[in-house]
Curated annotation (Swiss-Prot):
Family: Belongs to the alpha-ketoglutarate dehydrogenase family.
Gene behind the chain: odhA
CDD domains: TPP_E1_OGDC_like (cd02016)
Source species: Staphylococcus haemolyticus (strain JCSC1435)
Oligomer status and interactors: Homodimer. Part of the 2-oxoglutarate dehydrogenase (OGDH) complex composed of E1 (2-oxoglutarate dehydrogenase), E2 (dihydrolipoamide succinyltransferase) and E3 (dihydrolipoamide dehydrogenase); the complex contains multiple copies of the three enzymatic components (E1, E2 and E3).
SUPFAM superfamilies: Thiamin diphosphate-binding fold (THDP-binding) (SSF52518)
Bilayer-spanning residue ranges: none
Biased composition (Basic and acidic residues): 515-537
Protein name, UniProt field: 2-oxoglutarate dehydrogenase E1 component
Reaction catalyzed: N(6)-[(R)-lipoyl]-L-lysyl-[protein] + 2-oxoglutarate + H(+) = N(6)-[(R)-S(8)-succinyldihydrolipoyl]-L-lysyl-[protein] + CO2
GO cellular-component term (any): oxoglutarate dehydrogenase complex
Biological role stated in the UniProt entry: E1 component of the 2-oxoglutarate dehydrogenase (OGDH) complex which catalyzes the decarboxylation of 2-oxoglutarate, the first step in the conversion of 2-oxoglutarate to succinyl-CoA and CO(2).
SMART domains given in the database record: Transket_pyr (SM00861)
Length: 934
């Protein structure tokens, strides 16, 4: 057996009973030499270079093996190839298997090995955990070939963590049989019969109606049910599911147990809520404008899997994959305890996310990269999401060759050290094992796991689509292919578990159940209310908080936040800045600037029992070095969070620097707040200009979710916005877009002019949380105004007064002929100009709340000005941007023909701002001068 050794210099390397361990280490060495000790690196390099002779020493009489180094090396290479590339030959395609070329060597013969040779080599050569299981290497390799080339394909060699990789290798290679008894197999078949029977019934009785059938990946439903069972075993009682439209109706029906009557009612356009279970176990919210049935979610409380679990399917727009970070945020909210001082305590066993992706959309949509990047970050981790790709190997009409540049749709997950299993959707019991492995891995390592459920799509993209127009060859084969219901049913018949008659009876029973459900529905009970009015709770704008504070109370809070541990060393330069926060309480001339107003607001909010969570790029310090919510010891780098030491704190405060992402982070915070409505979630953009990277979140969730789905959110956005000569990409948060989205009191949009109004606004928003009146808050937050003394206010403006939608400057109202309205920095620029150039004929008003537009408040001002001639709107943005186009109809209605109405601002522009700072100053001065002209 040593015929290849003639050119090899032999070295006496004999590992004896430790051979299996050493070969496992050698396997690690082949992947990453630095993963083993230095002395083993030297030894293994001699083996790799053909300089050593490795022999297994007999550990018991008559057993053991020896082989030349050439044979050992070939065995090792074969084993390594099977582990790394066996997935390329795995039996994971139910139909239309791809033709693969230029494959790595994966067969015994390709390594000049044979059965006889391998039968004389110990099984330990393959892996040490085989030594007590198989008699020799041939049996062990046979096992590995069946395992790695079977109905589950395994990819884990890309994982850098050696402990995780070793765990997966042992779990995969150790002989395992899913503990599925015949009763459970019957139940699996019954589930599949209901899954497919549901689709067949709808297909027959509602011809052409869109339902985005699950057929082809039907096993998704029993996989989800088994996941819930495994989660219950380790007492995970909150499951958050996110998915797009494909198969959604089936999941709603068979996982969330939405009654057939409700689902069929939606197809018949009758009122489904009449069939909502009376026990309250199923929560289905609805907005006043509504949404299509395959976007709707729900929440089911059930004890079907051993413990009481809350199973949520998130509402979802048509924008594929965009719900993923929302689900992650909802899960983290379910895991966080926020009802105590300090930062939240997180328990990964409280909740778990399941995200169901499409094979075309998973690599195609960047939101998946952003979301997976959150998975191991302290502020965002959920202890592992289960990702299931419902891989029907087509995206509408686009096949994989045109849809991605990778072998598998799951390849993007490799960059995040995530294990990947590909499983044949027609092998029911293999899909159950895939779930077992995933759940065991999550329990052990608290990390994400990806399962690629490889199937097909029985019909077109929707039920009106003819797929053979663009994909004739695949669909020729699909039409001839039996469904998994038939395949698994026949297998149970063949195994003697059920008879053919029993199989047919189960399938017939489903159709009878569906028909009985439809018979309960009154066809004449049509939904025909076109008014679709918003609820009473949204008839009024955000209401001020009426709570008053004493100066002593605010001083106590302020002092606590400026008191550090004795051994904590604040950077001296920063300490001087922070110490100035004592001045408002110690000096008549002391003013509370923007950052201090925010700190005081947050402190009083957590004292009221509302938790605060602030995230964004650089939010701990603040983009403009103003917040300093987390301090760093200048000597050792330790951190200290002043807001964790507020006296009488009843809820948590946390702040996190986010990854350089907008869409996923906004989606996460939105989801967190939807799940925990008593949490004040704030996302802060580095600059407001970058917020449009999350535009889908604003359009499809934040502004419209309540109207579509009845889903309440009180998410707050801080979007730094002001024209300060920094160019077109560091000036505008696109205020106009948020105003365009504003309707039906769905949000509050502000551009503030004072720190005290900011304080009262934050408290008003916090007060609304958890109520029917809660809604998103969009703040055009300041940049240079953060340190502006005109914006800063004395402490007595913080003790009472509440939020003011408008702020009217002092003036002799009898002399006023011109009313100038502005907001944010534009207002401050005008105020500072008029302070230097007084003019009694001009009255300046800060419109701090742009939406809902303060018509009533402005009308009161107009009525108090007997000699008024002109009303002017002044803004820094171009005429086609900013607030002008939004406020114009309101102002026109207010002034009528009684007063002149004028606009002052930049002319219409394609880009928001000038690129040159000096030109910016000229334009800004022109706006100011024109607005105060007689």
């Amino acid at each position: 057996m040593a015929k290849d050794n003639k050119d090899v210099t032999e070295a006496p390397v004999n590992f004896g009973a430790n051979l299996g361990l050493m070969l496992d280490l050698y396997d690690d060495y082949l992947q990453d030499p630095s993963s083993v000790p230095d002395d083993l690196q030297v030894l293994f390099s001699t083996i790799k270079n053909g300089e050593a002779h490795v022999a297994a020493k007999s550990t018991t009489e008559g057993s053991g093996s020896s082989a030349g180094d050439g044979t050992i090396k070939r065995i090792m290479r074969l084993i390594d190839n099977i582990r790394q590339y066996g997935h390329l030959k795995a039996d994971i395609y139910p139909v239309n298997a791809p033709k693969r070329t230029n494959l790595p060597k994966l067969e015994i013969e390709e390594f000049n090995l044979d059965k006889e040779t391998l039968e004389n080599v110990s099984a330990e050569i393959v892996s040490d955990h085989f030594k007590d299981i198989y008699d020799n290497a041939y049996e062990a390799i046979e096992r590995m070939e069946k395992r790695y080339k079977g109905p589950i394909a395994f990819e884990y060699n890309h994982i850098n963590n050696n402990k995780e990789r070793t765990w997966l290798k042992r779990r995969i290679e150790t002989p395992y049989r899913a503990n599925i008894n015949n009763d459970e197999r019957k139940k699996l078949f019954d589930t599949l019969a209901h899954v497919e029977g549901f689709e067949k019934y709808l297909h027959k009785n509602f011809v052409g109606a869109k339902r985005f059938s699950i057929e082809g990946v039907d096993t998704l439903v029993p996989m989800l049910q088994h996941t819930l069972k495994r989660a219950a075993e380790i007492e995970i009682n909150n499951i958050q599911i996110g998915m797009a439209h494909r198969g959604r109706l089936n999941v709603l029906t068979h996982v969330l147990e939405k009654p057939y009557e409700m689902m069929i009612s939606e197809f018949m356009h009758t009122d489904p809520m009449k069939f909502l279970p009376e026990d309250g176990s199923l929560e289905l919210t609805a907005g006043w404008t509504g949404d299509v049935k395959y976007h709707l979610g729900g929440v089911k409380t059930t004890s079907s899997y051993g413990i009481e679990q809350r199973i949520s399917l998130a509402n979802n727009p048509s924008h594929l994959e965009i719900v993923a970070p929302v689900v992650i945020g909802k899960t983290r909210a379910s895991q966080d305890d926020t009802k105590h001082a300090g930062k939240p305590t997180t328990d990964f066993h409280k909740g778990m996310p399941i995200i169901i992706h499409g094979d075309a959309a998973y690599p195609g949509q960047g939101i998946n990269f952003e979301t997976m990047n959150l998975s191991n970050l302290d502020g965002y981790s959920t202890g592992g999401a289960l990702h299931i790709i419902t891989n029907n190997r087509i995206g509408f009409t686009t096949e994989p060759v045109d849809g991605r540049s990778t072998t598998y749709s799951t390849d993007i997950a490799k960059g995040y050290d995530v294990p990947i299993l590909h499983v044949n959707a027609d092998d029911v019991e293999a899909t159950i094992e895939a779930i077992d492995i995933a759940m065991e891995f999550r329990k052990e390592f608290h990390k994400d796991f990806v399962i690629d459920l490889v199937g097909y799509r029985r019909y077109g993209h929707n039920e009106m689509d003819e797929p053979s127009i663009t994909n004739p060859l695949p669909y020729h084969n699909i039409r001839k292919h039996d469904s998994v219901e038939i395949i698994y049913g026949n297998k149970l018949v063949e195994d003697g578990v059920i008879s053919k008659e029993q199989m047919e009876d189960v399938m017939d029973k489903v159709q009878k159940e569906m028909r009985a459900a439809q018979d309960k529905i009154d066809k004449s009970d049509k939904m025909d209310n076109p008014d679709m009015e918003r609820p009473e709770s949204l008839q009024e704008p955000l209401q001020s908080d009426d709570k008053d504070f004493s100066v002593d109370h605010l001083k106590e809070i302020n002092d606590a936040m400026l008191t550090y541990p004795e051994d904590f060393h604040v950077l001296k330069k920063l300490n001087k800045v922070l110490e100035k926060r004592r001045e408002p309480f110690e000096s008549e001339n002391g003013l509370v600037d923007w950052a201090q107003a925010e700190q005081l607001a947050f402190a009083t909010i957590v004292q009221d029992g509302i938790s605060v969570r602030l995230t964004g790029q650089d939010s701990e310090r603040g983009t403009f070095s103003h917040r300093h919510a987390v301090l760093h010891d200048e000597e050792n780098g330790d951190t200290f969070t002043p807001l964790h030491h507020v006296p009488n704190q009843k809820a948590t405060f946390e702040v996190h620097n986010s990854p350089l992402s907008e869409a996923a982070v906004v989606g996460f915070e939105y989801g967190y707040n939807v799940e925990n409505k008593n949490s004040m979630n704030i996302w802060e953009a580095q600059y407001g200009d970058f917020s449009n990277m999350a535009q889908m979140m604003f359009d499809n969730f934040m502004s419209s979710a309540r109207a579509k789905w009845g889903e309440r959110s009180g998410l707050t956005l801080f979007l730094p916005h002001a024209f300060e000569g920094q160019g077109p990409e560091h000036s505008s948060a696109r205020l106009e877009r948020f105003l365009q989205l504003a309707a039906e009191n769905n949000s509050t949009v502000v551009n503030l002019s004072s720190s005290s109004n900011y304080f009262h606004l934050l408290r008003a928003q916090a007060k609304s949380l958890g109520t029917e009146a809660m809604r998103p808050l969009i703040v055009m937050s300041p940049k240079s105004l953060l340190r502006n003394k005109t914006v800063a206010k004395p402490i007595d403006q913080f003790t009472s007064g509440g939020f003011k939608p408008i702020i009217v400057e002092d003036g002799n109202k009898e002399k006023v002929t011109k009313l100038v309205l502005a907001s944010g920095k534009m207002f401050i620029d005008l105020k500072e100009h008029l302070a230097k150039n007084p003019d009694d004929s001009i009255l300046l008003v800060a419109v701090d709340r742009l939406y809902p537009f303060p018509e009533g408040e402005i009308k009161e001002v107009l009525n108090e000005l007997p000699n008024l001639e002109t009303v002017s709107w002044v803004q820094e943005e171009p005429k086609n941007q900013g607030a002008w186009l939004f406020v114009y109809p309101y102002l026109k209605s207010l002034v009528g023909n009684q007063f002149n109405l004028s606009y002052h601002g930049r002319i219409q522009r394609a880009a928001p701002a000038e690129g040159d700072g000096e030109i910016h100053k000229l334009v800004q001065n022109q706006i100011i001068e024109s607005s105060i002209e007689k």
